[in-house]
Amino acid sequence: MSGGSTGERPFSDIITSVRYWVIHSITIPALFVAGWLFVSTGLAYDVFGTPRPNEYFTQDRQQVPLVNDRFNAKQELEDLTKGI
């Protein structure tokens, strides 16, 4: 069986073209900068709902919030989240 042509450009032609590198020399650094800003401004914490590093422990709650008894987990979670 001989392989047929799908009509697409070969990958080697694409990555050796000037047009490819003009486009990607702009978009790759732009994505990096956008990701850095997303994390450094704290927007990632807000979007994903995770606590910021200084919010893990409050003055009232200094213990690690672990559930120890799986059969009474609901009650333990209510006790742990009571002050939040």
Curated annotation (Swiss-Prot):
Main localization category: plastid
GO MF term set: electron transfer activity; heme binding; iron ion binding
Membrane association type: Single-pass membrane protein
SUPFAM superfamilies named among the record's database cross-references: Cytochrome b559 subunits (SSF161045)
UniProt-listed GO biological process terms: photosynthetic electron transport chain
PROSITE patterns given in the database record: CYTOCHROME_B559 (PS00537)
InterPro entries per the UniProt record, alphabetical: PSII_cyt_b559_asu, PSII_cyt_b559_asu_sf, PSII_cyt_b559_CS, PSII_cyt_b559_N, PSII_cytb559_asu_lum
A GO cellular-component term linked to this record: chloroplast thylakoid membrane
TM region positions: 22-36
Residues binding heme, per UniProt: 24
Record's cofactor remark: With its partner (PsbF) binds heme. PSII binds additional chlorophylls, carotenoids and specific lipids.
Cofactor(s) listed: heme b
Subcellular location: Plastid, Chloroplast thylakoid membrane
Keywords: Chloroplast, Electron transport, Heme, Iron, Membrane, Metal-binding, Photosynthesis, Photosystem II, Plastid, Thylakoid, Transmembrane, Transmembrane helix, Transport
Family: Belongs to the PsbE/PsbF family.
Description of how the protein assembles with itself and partners: Heterodimer of an alpha subunit and a beta subunit. PSII is composed of 1 copy each of membrane proteins PsbA, PsbB, PsbC, PsbD, PsbE, PsbF, PsbH, PsbI, PsbJ, PsbK, PsbL, PsbM, PsbT, PsbX, PsbY, PsbZ, Psb30/Ycf12, at least 3 peripheral proteins of the oxygen-evolving complex and a large number of cofactors. It forms dimeric complexes.
Function: This b-type cytochrome is tightly associated with the reaction center of photosystem II (PSII). PSII is a light-driven water:plastoquinone oxidoreductase that uses light energy to abstract electrons from H(2)O, generating O(2) and a proton gradient subsequently used for ATP formation. It consists of a core antenna complex that captures photons, and an electron transfer chain that converts photonic excitation into a charge separation.
Name of protein: Cytochrome b559 subunit alpha
Annotated source species: Porphyra purpurea (Red seaweed)
